Amino acid sequence: MRVAFVTTIDDEAIEDDVDLDLEKLAFAAAGLELHLAPWEDESVEWTSFDLVVVRTPWNYVEHLPAFRRWLAGLDATTRLWNPAPVIEWNLDKRYLLDLSSRGVAIVPTAYIDSVAEFRDSVSSIETGEFILKPSISAGSRLTGRFSVGDPHAESLAMQIIGAGLIVMVQPLASSVDHLGEIGTVVFDGEVSHSFRKGPILASGGELIGGAYREDISPIRAPDDVLALVREASAVATDHLRAMQWMGRDEELLYARFDVVRLDDRSPALLEAELFEPCFFLPTDPAAVDRFVTAVLARLAG
């Protein structure tokens, strides 16, 4: 059977894909014919594949209108996972509001679209530092960590608003500096593996070391973190089914949930990535086989 991974023609955007080599080997071993298909390539016949899996279209933020047109223009017979309406919902991090309204603990987040609102939001932060980013972003683009009163924060907020985007303001969870984030990958509704993500952002709007580098290591996620991940996964799936963006009995093919500990030590969801997450498969030798099993089940369905 023929499976397409949706990727991009921008080689630089995907040069840090740590999953692909393992995926190629595992798919071949399972007898699957894997093709890398850039979303920008108009010659690709998406309906010719038995399954189309969105994996690394990591330049979509810079080409958002075109990416959305591509997504909307896919033939209804294309077997796309995760489905196009799910991707459209997950593009904008305001999806956190949907999860929070259904009881999922999230990192406190203000969504603002004016400088005046930004000033009011920052003035209420008690932790001393906060994270600022657009609601549509990837790879820490237009993202910064700032102290309250840092003028560079307002400059970044103005840049985001000027680009027609919504600004997200989140009080810094100080645990990130020593505990990092815990990412957990779910395949076909079942937890696969977890990993630790070290801090990336330095105070003052800079990146640690001056460049975007992810510090990833394997970890056994604590029970309370896994409980939150399972809750978030179930709530998201129920919401997507209720919206009729997935079938009544369908699971997401894949998802990744990033969790931090708040200053009261409770876990809180930072992001739920449902369409282009890195799985960091090298952190668990069995993870790639779980992914292939999920793909095979989807092909058999």
Question: What are the roles of these predicted feature ranges?
Answer:
Residues S147-A242, V260, A268:
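Phosphate-binding site of ATP-dependent enzymes
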